[in-house]
Amino acid sequence: MDLPGPIHDILLVFLGLGLILGGLGVVLLTNPIYSAFSLGLVLVCISLFHIPSNSYFVAAAQLLIYVGAVNVLIVFAVMFMNGSEYSNDFHLWTVGDGVTSLVCTSILFSLITTIWNTSWYGIIWTTRSNQIIEQDLTSNVQQIGIRLATDFYLPFELISIILLAALIGAIAMARQ
């Protein structure tokens, strides 16, 4: 998507804010239904991050798979939970929670300082020009198809066999 610079930046800021607010909603909301819907917002924002970089197929695939299937499955599973059994032994704050939040906060601040102090100019311009021309000649779907049929053929087939085994196992468990 060829957007002007300020519009592109504003779009990324709004997607980032939606991602942060949705992530906070997943963690902080006590109702599991609201938390699952916040996870849906996070997954939508992640899939929409691919649109400004002209990866429409990846955005559509993530939107269909994660939001359309995984999040609906999570909401469906949360609906079957019995909420009363989880809220009986609820402690507001434990020592493990404090240690975990301290570790996560220190990792967050170290990542922020690393990103802030990194010179991104040299990283952006290291791509060779012939790679850019080769990528522009084919669409995203063609690039994915070429990569799956050549470089990633064996891993693709192994993943399909693993998924088939998981499906057969799920059917066998459902029959019992």
UniProtKB/Swiss-Prot annotation:
GO CC annotations, alphabetized: chloroplast thylakoid membrane
Location(s) in or outside the cell: Plastid, Chloroplast thylakoid membrane
Primary location group: plastid
rRNA-binding is among the record's keywords: no
One MF term in the entry's GO annotations: quinone binding
Oligomer and partners: NDH is composed of at least 16 different subunits, 5 of which are encoded in the nucleus.
Protein name per the record: NAD(P)H-quinone oxidoreductase subunit 6, chloroplastic
Source species: Calycanthus floridus var. glaucus
Gene: ndhG
